[in-house]
């Protein structure tokens, strides 16, 4: 069976990682005095992170992949608890980052932005690594064809980034 959901999850992870890397690269260039802070760019990239991971990607994982995996394997419970908690923490961290960025207009503090953004990016990269290297193999091991049909359907909805 072709598993489109896994390909989509990994593709979305690559996209999210690329945006985070772009943010960090711009912050590093600003800190080094090579570029001026581009608030439009920062805000557009933050909008992407709020739209894609927080409103599209994580809800699909929670509602479909994680839910079905919980039903099929107690082996996955601890990692799923951890990842779901990280989804909540990620939203909180992103709200804090947005506040730092909103304050940047009035009081530019590239060091505060760098510190918060670096911590956020590292936590997201670690999170995505656990999904790719722990959850997906468990899902491949335990989920049924019927589970994958439902998961694939859910992930295909946004395959062409229609909701972004």
Which sequence ranges carry the predicted segments?
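Small-residue-biased structural context
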Residues: 1-164
């Amino acid at each position: 069976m072709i598993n489109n959901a896994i390909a989509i999850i990994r593709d979305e992870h690559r996209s999210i990682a690329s945006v985070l890397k772009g943010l960090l690269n711009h912050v590093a260039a600003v800190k080094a005095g090579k570029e001026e802070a581009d608030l439009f760019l920062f805000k557009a990239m933050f909008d992407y992170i709020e739209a894609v991971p927080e409103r599209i990607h994580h809800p699909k994982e929670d509602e479909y992949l994680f839910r079905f995996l919980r039903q099929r394997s107690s082996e996955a419970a601890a990692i799923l608890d951890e990842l779901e908690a990280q989804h909540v923490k990620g939203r909180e961290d992103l709200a804090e980052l947005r506040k730092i960025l909103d304050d940047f207009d009035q009081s530019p503090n590239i060091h505060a932005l760098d510190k918060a953004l670096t911590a956020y990016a590292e936590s997201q990269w670690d999170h995505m690594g656990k999904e790719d290297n722990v959850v997906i193999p468990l899902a491949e091991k335990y989920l049924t064809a019927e589970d994958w049909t439902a998961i694939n359907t859910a992930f295909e909805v946004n395959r062409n980034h229609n909701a972004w």
